[in-house]
Amino acid sequence: MLASGLPRVKAEPNDLGARLDCLLGAWLSTGPLASGVPMGASHGIGYVLGAEFGVPHGHTSCIMLPAVMRWNKPANEHRQALISTAMLQSGSDAGDTLDRLIGGLGMPRSLSAVKIGREHFQRIAVQAMATPWVPRNPRPIESPDQLREILELAR
């Protein structure tokens, strides 16, 4: 619902059907979060980007989620295929599909877009390792080096 509704609202802000799709999509997305579905590296890194660099939460998700999905793909390729299908892009890479959606909405898609360079990656990685979300990532993250790999994907 969000994958189709958000671009329609961007193109035509007064489209009430598109707005309803976005409302319902947002509401449905809260169910898994409320029932305890764990968040992973995207939220762990995003927490640091917000706390240390003032990047808004919505922007951190737009920047980090496609990169984290690409990094996680070896661990959850089947689940990512379901995401691509739900976004009406069956057979496409889920990280790429999400990145195209984000780009089409005019949201930031890279760390450089929010003025965060490589010189900060080590500090971000070390701090993100201490969050409660990184240990719950679908593909285990055992060191800041692995988080720096993800940050490079988002550069």
Kindly label every feature range from the protein language model.
Residues 1-97:
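Active-site segments that bind and position negatively charged phosphate/pyrophosphate groups
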Residues 89-155:
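C-terminal charged capping/lid subdomain of soluble metabolic enzymes
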